[in-house]
Amino acid sequence: MLLSAIHFYGLLLACTFTRSYSAFKNDATEILYSHVVKPAPASPSSNSTLNQARNGGRHYAGTGSDRNNRVQVGCRELRSTKYISDGQCTSINPLKELVCAGECLPLPLLPNWIGGGYGTKYWSRRSSQEWRCVNDKTRTQRIQLQCQDGSIRTYKITVVTACKCKRYTRQHNESSHNFEGTSQAKPVQHHKERKRASKSSKHSTS
């Protein structure tokens, strides 16, 4: 009787231990897989990044054909230093200004150019005559003039700070010349002379 009771309690403990072990195992597996970190969503890459990766990380403003067809032209700037006088008054310090009277040339032909030499073979003397160096940017500067009597006068002058090349086409010049020629060639009194001649002929016949 005692042995049967011990055997019964032993089976009961074995069943309880088996259930708790299976529950512990299931809990462990659930906890393990519930804390799996999801991969972070990739940040949307912009088109510029994709293009940069495809082009090897280099950015080009234009293609090679544009480089050969478009010739960038610049002025050979002339700098002058002079004194300004007004009667018996002369500027205390010399005035340094930029004179836009140089020749327009491609950038590779300018003395301070450090880039490549593309586009120079398309340049000719005729092309240089179509471009003119003109004023681009100016600023107002104050200068002091000292007179012989010891007084000091202050003047405001405009100083050129940058030059640019402006293109004048040959057709524009020719059309302007033709317009002037035709306007000058038309006699104003031509029709009046005809009327006078017709009137004089009528009087003579009458």
Curated annotation (Swiss-Prot):
Query: GO:BP terms for this protein?
Result: negative regulation of BMP signaling pathway; negative regulation of Wnt signaling pathway; Wnt signaling pathway
User: Which stretches are tagged as biased composition: Polar residues?
Assistant: 43-54
Looking at the record, the residues that make up the CTCK domain are 75-170
PROSITE patterns reported for this sequence:
CTCK_2
For this record, the Gene Ontology CC terms, alphabetical, are: extracellular space
Q: Which Gene3D superfamilies match?
A: Cystine-knot cytokines
Q: Does the keyword Secreted apply?
A: yes
- Source species, domain of life: Eukaryota
Q: Where is the composition biased (Basic residues)?
A: 188-206
Question: Where in the chain are disulfide-linked cysteines found?
Answer: C75-C133, C89-C147, C100-C163, C104-C165
Q: Where is this region: Disordered?
A: 40-68, 176-206
UniProt entry keywords in alphabetical sequence: Disulfide bond, Glycoprotein, Secreted, Signal, Wnt signaling pathway
Using the record, list the residue span of the signal peptide; answer none if the entry has no such feature.
1-22
The protein's matches in InterPro entries, at most eight in alphabetical order, are given as:
Cys_knot_C, Cystine-knot_cytokine, Sclerostin/SOSTDC1
Residues with glycosylation annotation? N47, N173
State where the protein is found. Answer: Secreted
User: GO MF annotations for this entry?
Assistant: BMP binding
Q: Which PANTHER family match?
A: SCLEROSTIN DOMAIN-CONTAINING PROTEIN 1, SCLEROSTIN-RELATED
The entry assigns this protein to a family as follows: Belongs to the sclerostin family.
The entry describes its oligomerization and partners as: Interacts with LRP6.
Briefly state the protein's biological role.
Can activate or inhibit Wnt signaling in a context-dependent manner. Activates the canonical Wnt pathway whereby acts through Disheveled proteins and beta-catenin. Antagonises Wnt signaling through the canonical pathways presumably by blocking accessibility of certain WNTs to their receptors. Induces posterior neural markers via components of the canonical Wnt pathway.
- List the protein's name: Sclerostin domain-containing protein 1
Source species: Gallus gallus
By which gene is this protein encoded?
A: SOSTDC1
